[in-house]
């Protein structure tokens, strides 16, 4: 039977609040107008996407959301965010590469969470 570290076991207000803050940050990052997005060297935006969605996956698991449900929701959210960026007057563009980075971030976040869960003796 798998048991998380004690600090990860409680799905209380702190874990749910952390997930809520991560979602709000993602909304601000993903839907900021193009003028508000700082310029960066090539590839940095993909790293930001990966880290953002890894954070969403980790905090979502800590909040108690089941892995399969969370993965489906986050990958769907990533796809919708790219479509909205492409269709909206934000001056942003849709990118399959961004979506792939988002999906990879979900996988990384879930893998890190799974690694934090340890097998209990017995």
Feature-to-residue mapping (PLM):
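Bulky hydrophobic segments
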Residues: 1-99, 103, 107-122
């Amino acid at each position: 039977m798998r048991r998380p570290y004690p600090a990860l076991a409680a799905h209380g207000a702190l874990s749910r609040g952390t997930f809520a803050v991560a979602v709000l940050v993602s909304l601000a990052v993903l839907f900021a107008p193009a003028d508000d997005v700082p310029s960066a060297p090539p590839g940095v935006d993909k790293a930001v996407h990966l880290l953002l969605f890894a954070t969403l996956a980790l905090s979502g698991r800590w909040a108690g959301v089941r892995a399969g449900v969370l993965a489906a929701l986050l990958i769907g959210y990533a796809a919708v965010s790219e479509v909205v960026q492409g269709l909206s007057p934000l001056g942003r563009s849709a990118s399959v590469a961004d979506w792939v980075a988002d999906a990879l971030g979900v996988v990384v976040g879930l893998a890190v969470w799974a690694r934090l869960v340890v097998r209990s003796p017995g």
